Design a protein with these regions (language model features):
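Terminal low-complexity tails and localization/encapsulation signals of metabolic enzymes
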Residues: 230-238
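Glycine- (often His-adjacent) and acidic-residue-rich active-site loop
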Residues: 41, 49-83, 102
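Well-ordered beta-strand positions
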Residues: 115, 154, 158-160, 166, ...
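C-terminal long alpha-helix characteristic of the crotonase
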Residues: 117-122, 173-215, 224
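Conserved CoA-thioester-binding segment of acyl-CoA-metabolizing enzymes
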Residues: 1-48, 85
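CoA-thioester-processing core
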Residues: 83, 87-89, 97, 103-156, ...
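Residue-level detector of structured alpha->beta connecting loops
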Residues: 40-43, 91, 114
Length: 238
């Protein structure tokens, strides 16, 4: 249901429920938590859905239909909010590889990532209003940070469906790739981030004291990786 692949510092988490359009069920939450535990220490993480129809289609209504009390609804929302927070706070860069549509809660999972890469034929919508509910997994706040408060209210309040190009234009998606080269594209990006000090850059961008940023730079400066790269540059003919 949730698969984790670890290779050369890259963790790829795949929600593998294509028959349910990769919807989030209680067992999916269990396995996502375990996958994130196991991915600790990765230098980059990708979250994606199986197949090419859906990234994540939101909560699995069939399996969540038993939730009928206020307490149970709050518990479910807090749990998924916690999972999305773990994605957002992961110490290395997180990429949402949007291989298919992302609706409702799926859009919330996408905006929990640092970078969203989308196939050119996908659609994304914060369309919880169609079910007379609202984003509750932290997606409303993250949407506002990405596109601005007014546009976030417009998108989530109306449930507007955006295609990949529109999503990129408003800042909701960072890179759009042709469907034919999508898999190779997100994998190349993820590997480049895993092989760079992107985790330190993410930490500085998250807001640290100047002394911490300088210390992070200095640690990289004295690393073997830096001097191997520097020696390679210095040895080139001029």
């Amino acid at each position: 249901m949730v698969e984790l692949e670890l290779s050369d510092g890259l963790a790829v988490v795949t929600i593998d429920r294509p028959q349910a359009r990769n919807a989030i069920a209680p067992e999916t939450m269990d396995q996502l938590e375990k996958a994130l535990d196991a991915a600790e220490g990765a230098r980059a993480l990708v979250i994606r859905g199986a197949g090419d129809k859906a990234f994540v289609s939101g909560g699995d209504l069939k399996q969540l239909s038993a939730i009928r009390t206020l307490e149970a609804a709050e518990a479910m929302a807090w749990r998924m909010r916690g999972i999305c927070d773990r994605l957002a706070d992961f110490p290395a860069p997180v990429i949402a590889a949007m291989n298919g549509h992302a609706f409702g809660g799926g859009a919330e999972v996408a905006v929990a990532a640092d970078i969203r890469v989308a196939a050119d034929d996908i659609k994304i919508a914060f369309n919880q209003v169609a079910l007379a509910i609202m984003p509750a997994w932290g997606g409303a706040e993250r949407l506002g940070a990405l596109v601005g408060r007014s546009r976030a209210l417009l998108l989530a309040g109306s449930g507007t469906v955006l295609d990949a190009a529109e999503a990129e234009r408003v800042g909701l998606v960072d890179r759009v790739l042709p469907r034919a080269s999508f898999e190779e594209g997100w994998l190349a990006l993820a590997r480049s981030l895993a092989n760079a000090p992107a985790g330190e850059i993410k930490r500085v961008l998250s807001g640290v004291a100047p002394a911490e940023a300088v210390n992070a730079f200095a640690r990289l400066w004295v690393s073997d990786e830096h001097w191997a790269a520097a020696d390679n540059v210095l040895s080139r003919p001029r």
